[in-house]
Amino acid sequence: MSLRVRQIDRREWLLAQTATECQRHGREATLEYPTRQGMWVRLSDAEKRWSAWIKPGGWLEHVSPALAGAAVSAGAEHLVVPWLAATERPFELPVPHLSCRRLCVENPVPGSALPEGKLLHIMSDRGGLWFEHLPELPAVGGGRPKMLRWPLRFVIGSSDTQRSLLGRIGIGDVLLIRTSRAEVYCYAKKLGHFNRVEGGIIVETLDIQHIEEENNTTETAETLPGLNQLPVKLEFVLYRKNVTLAELEAMGQQQLLSLPTNVELNVEIMANGVLLGNGELVQMNDTLGVEIHEWLSESGNGE
């Protein structure tokens, strides 16, 4: 079944967005088809960020309705072009976010040369402007979404192994943490480091501006001897917490983050980003490890 997707013309969409913004500020702005009668002149800024059309006869009529007819018949509308080119600010732009250091004025063309489609019609202090192209509206900040949260995980270490080992792991085994570390992650981004203290943890460094990419890849040879030798990265997650932006900023000020009671009894074991089990954080001789309490084998029977 094919999807019926509504097509949107980006040019007209930008014109419509600007029309809505102008109307919100009390200025009349409409999307409509211009008349193809008479002569037209295309204007733009030097950077070509916007372009618009004017009808010189309409501008003369706006200035002096009584003289407009005689002026057009005498060819006076052609004088509008050099006047526009010679005047530094011939009119005030009716769209607030537009600017123009230098106006580019093209030669008059007949109405048949106007582009297809609707144009945005807005009145300036000199006459009507018919905008053909407009840039995007400036972004308006809506403040922080207070209900939005980010998932943090506090990692105490990792171990590199191979796929063949996973099939031999069972409940009661102890997975040793080969690389001890205390790092804070949000999704695949490393935010900083933390220290474990009595009653919780303290985030020592929190760099939100320069977030590092987590490297989930393991150095391997160019060719693998078999699927069982595929690399696996085990990650041991001490704690997870969803935080607001304000809470995240507070962590960077080394505030104490309280941990749930017995958090050491439920350390998550991730393999290449997938949760495979959990267990208790233990220390075997001089090496930290996790004694497995729950394990999801590849057969899915939990053994």
From Swiss-Prot:
Keywords: Virulence. SUPFAM superfamilies: Surface presentation of antigens (SPOA). It comes from the Bacteria. The keyword DNA repair does not apply. InterPro entries: FliN-like_C, SpoA-like_sf, T3SS_OMP_SpaO, T3SS_SpaO/YscQ/SpaO. It holds the Pfam family FliMN_C. One of its GO terms (biological process) is bacterial-type flagellum-dependent swarming motility. PANTHER family: FLAGELLAR MOTOR SWITCH PROTEIN FLIM, SECRETION SYSTEM APPARATUS PROTEIN SSAQ. Belongs to the FliN/MopA/SpaO family. Involved in a secretory pathway responsible for the surface presentation of determinants needed for the entry of Salmonella species into mammalian cells. This is Surface presentation of antigens protein SpaO. The lineage of its organism: Bacteria, Pseudomonadati, Pseudomonadota, Gammaproteobacteria, Enterobacterales.
